Amino acid sequence: MSMNLIGITSPGVASAIAAAGGRLAGVETQSVEAAGLVALLFRSKDTSWQFLRRSRTALESMVRAQRILEAAAMFGPLLPARPGSLIRDDLEACTLLCGHSRQLAESLRLHGNTTQFQVTITWNPMAALAARRDHPDLAAAAAAGARGAAKEAGHLISRFMADERVAFEAEAMRALATVARDVIALPVDQADMLMNAAVLLAPGAEPDLEHALEALDGSLPGENRIRLIGPLPPVSFAAVSIDRPSRDRVAAARRLLGVREATERHDLRRAYLDIARAHHPDTGAHAAGAQAVGAAAEAFRLLARIAEARLCAEQGDVLLVDILRHDQHRSVST
């Protein structure tokens, strides 16, 4: 049975979790230590989230994962894994830690002490209109309604409310940016929601965030609700993302570069440069050459990373690791 990767932490934090009973949010965890780092894991029968889609099981898994992350963060620095990241066994966990120890340790140092909050702000549109009834645009809408021009009145009100939403969201994002290390705008998926964002905070910055939200609440007339979810480890800003390149994908990259399986990195680079030179504009290559060079560069990066990872994983699948933001996506071959 595969294990879910919670995140990467230090031996000290892992020991503290174990001393407290080894359970996070009621879930039994285990740890694998190697290269001065620890992979925190828990066993789960759930299928990976990418297959669960929008099912109720997926939602329950997401809520449970969030609670586990919240509980883990209470013990100390943690570099979270992208939700749904699976590790097959202890050996693969060791491969992950040993093969990417420098990258993981540096990311843990940079991001492990940061915290993430989700901020949502909703309003009552009718209360917002009532609080702004003296605004010139709404006065014009009232006048239009009084003379029977209901369509014009509705248009004026809709435009006013849309402008207010856009202006407030921009103001809110600016306010959050002044107190946060980073801000990611999240989808606004409810009719009464004005904004939805994830904010990354440095240690001790929570009071600054609270003050900024109080100021925003005061600037927005009507009935408003500000919801703050967290703290969490920085899962939207610095999540461990694991990739296992398929055989077909690797074979396609080798064919594109014209190299064999055991090709060294310097030979991979030479193969890529040969393609780049052949498609250089000075050689009279067509515009499509840029696309060919881009594909060759992607293939080179993939095969070079695999060659490096193979130094630590002589058996089993190769693991490629990136530390990604929520709004970042791994390229086709990296």
Regions found by a protein language model. Name each.
Residues 1-225, 231-245, 250, 320-334:
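An interfacial alpha-helical scaffold signature
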Residues 223, 238-287, 295-334:
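N-terminal J-domain/J-like co-chaperone modules of DnaJ/Hsp40 proteins
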